[in-house]
């Protein structure tokens, strides 16, 4: 079968390669991939050439499919079930994070479809979910409810991230306002979570390149206002829209240093920033404001079983909308077109399906 693989250790590019179909062990589950989505985490390796031919991983950690095989010792899953993976492949099972069910904060975690794994990912025909993870973490897989299709289920990862950031990590109360910085899937699902939870003003901050595609979708999904950070004073505009006493929560999804600076500045005293986006440059500004005005910066990583259980119910109920965000549906053989669309921001979410003849 074909698979889109990454090569090199720290950074490296992608190649479409031939790989054998995974062998199902006695405790394993093999999924036939029905839909896989390109994530922002996949983009950092696109058009990168490390000069290395060392295999790293089959990519694609946002995927859903149908169980094709189960090992003889597997009791909880059956061939034919429609499932979505939370992309856990390995955790230690004994650290404080694992004991709390926060498996993706395990320092020994290995994710399916991400770096340095041998089990596989969504950018192929089949992916193996190892029995070792299913013994520790049964909810490494979730059954897809009736009425939810594969492409919607494939993007439950960012939905669950948005759920956890607002519903579980922040102290948000209905009737307050929320600013979301960033217009990718994490940002747009955060808009929907803020709407569901009863925010009055939901302000989305983006850039000039978001005006054509992403701003209109943000409004369709519940944003009450958009702010163009390329042409407007972000802090002043957000405070003007919300009023200085109502802006208690900023969900920062871009990872840009300037965005974190703006988020801290615009908050009212005792406000919170949940930092969902990840940047790679040292901070170049003072954060004394968080001490002077009792503001909080909350780090965010992934989700837990509560996030998944409730996000799946919201998706099945129709409260969460995915279709407006799926801008491209392509075969895996056209993967470069999908990545290019992500680069130029004509895409929000790209869904790929396996289209190679065996």
UniProtKB/Swiss-Prot annotation:
GO molecular function: oxidoreductase activity; zinc ion binding
Keywords recorded for this protein, A-Z: Metal-binding, Oxidoreductase, Zinc
UniProt cross-references to Gene3D superfamilies, sorted A to Z: Medium-chain alcohol dehydrogenases, catalytic domain, NAD(P)-binding Rossmann-like Domain
Pfam families for the chain: ADH_N (PF08240), ADH_zinc_N (PF00107)
Cofactor binding annotation: Binds 2 Zn(2+) ions per subunit.
EC number: 1.-.-.-
Protein known as: Uncharacterized zinc-type alcohol dehydrogenase-like protein YdjL
Protein's organism: Escherichia coli (strain K12)
Top-level taxonomy: Bacteria, Pseudomonadati, Pseudomonadota, Gammaproteobacteria, Enterobacterales
